[in-house]
């Protein structure tokens, strides 16, 4: 299985002036689902509504071959991105390296981000594809983009509530194949 690190829609990617056939040639089996990450963050931070969120995740499902869609690596953070807890806080990234290194969410920012994080994990862990949790996200690690997202795991200082809720969602996912290989049908109320 070869999963590529393609940050955009891999079905229609143009790189260096050339259309790439990542999912339609003999290149990649699937990709890291950065479009899902962006849609989840934008939706939970209130930058897009439910219809736009649905349109963005539906375009992935519609554009990708089924075998690539069901093998998507569904991510919220990676070694190159802002940590999901920090991203969901809605705070602006500081301008300097020193400010980024020293930054920690306030209690109110952390609580807001954590509520959004529970919703984010619910969405990502119950979507078709392969969920991937970047080390420390399940423990409440914070950090801006590389290298500030690559800190040491907080042994002994984990946010146990996040860890326990993620574990419960993983158990729920394992309880039914519908979560990994089922279909999504949008219902509007």
For each feature predicted by the language model, list its residue ranges.
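Carbohydrate-interacting/catalytic domains
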Residues: 18, 111-114, 126-133, 137-189
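Active-site-proximal helices and loops of the catalytic beta/alpha 8
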Residues: 1-72, 123, 140-168
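Catalytic-core region of carbohydrate-active enzymes that cleave or remodel glycosidic bonds
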Residues: 10, 46-139, 156-157, 173
């Amino acid at each position: 299985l070869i999963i590529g690190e393609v940050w955009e829609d891999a079905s229609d990617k143009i790189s260096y002036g050339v259309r790439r056939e990542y999912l339609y040639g003999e290149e990649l089996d699937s990709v890291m689902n950065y479009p899902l990450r962006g849609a989840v963050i934008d939706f939970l931070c209130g930058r897009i509504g439910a219809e736009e969120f649905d349109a963005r995740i539906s375009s992935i499902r519609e554009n990708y071959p089924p075998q690539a869609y069901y093998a998507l690596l569904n991510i919220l953070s990676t070694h190159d991105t802002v940590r999901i807890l920090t991203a969901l806080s809605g705070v602006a990234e500081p301008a300097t390296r020193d400010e980024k290194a020293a930054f920690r969410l306030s209690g109110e920012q952390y609580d807001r981000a954590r509520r959004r994080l529970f919703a984010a994990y619910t969405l990502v862990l119950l979507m078709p594809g392969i969920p991937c949790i970047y080390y420390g996200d399940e423990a409440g690690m914070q950090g801006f983009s590389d290298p500030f997202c690559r800190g040491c795991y907080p042994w002994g200082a984990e946010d146990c509530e996040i860890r326990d809720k993620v574990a419960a969602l993983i158990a729920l996912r394992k309880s039914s194949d519908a979560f990994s290989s089922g279909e999504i049908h949008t219902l509007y109320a």
